[in-house]
Amino acid sequence: QGPTAAIVPIKQLGTNGGGYFGVNSSHPLENPTYLTNMIECWAILILPMAMVFAFGFYLKRKKLAYSIFGVMLFAYLAGVWINVSQETGGNPRIDAMGIAQDNGAMEGKEVRLGSAATALWSVTTTVTSNGSVNGMHDSTMPLSGMIEMLNMQINTWFGGVGVGWMNYFTFIIIAVFISGLMVGRTPEFLGKKIEAREMKIATIVTLLHPFVILVGTSLAAYLYVHAPSFVENEGGWLNNPGFHGLSEMLYEFTSCAANNGSGFEGLGDNTWFWNYSCGIVLILGRFVPIVGQVA
């Protein structure tokens, strides 16, 4: 026990995601009722969404902000629809065993919250840089896990408190440049010309994200196959070897690069390798884009 009530608002409103308890907002002292679950889920999105409107307000270009918000909201709602339908539909493997799943796929979920609320949270926490959880992402259905991972790999929807939606802004720069070339005029955005220097920075920032994810995942996969003694000395890493084990490693580096923090927790990641490698990926994925945007 501890000052949980004081930490939860900071965790949620600040898109920080680090819970007082190890199981985060699955814990009844951190998220006791369905009402607190709704408030905490709302708190994740309120400031990242507000930043889009603040952009339009301060630049006096509200229509631009509305269009950006519309694209982000569409992507978010599409993810919510997929995850909620997947989780409330239940697991077909359990159906085949003749076991009723009236409440949906409840593995890794809290009974007081249910499958739909957990699915909603899983999308909300990955479209932002929050990373808090109210259920186990590792136990969600395959398509739900894909949406969670895809949200962080795209790494543009809503963003988070601190840097806002800077990655979406980078995609805007690239899109404006390409569209300017297509119509045969000098690309401009917000009255500023977009030239070779801006495009080089935008390209580096855009390509860095998948680069650090894939390099980290490939290194982990290589060590697991070719250095089994090293992996065993660290505790074995994978509790789910095979296809899902690769997904767990990919999710880990994706989450770090996106400054998210959620995980497929079947991965034993509290080891020297994972702490150091994820720390490096976190620094590169966080600070290089900030420097690029400022430049």
Regions found by a protein language model. Name each.
Residues 1-295:
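Membrane-proximal intracellular helices of multi-pass ion channels
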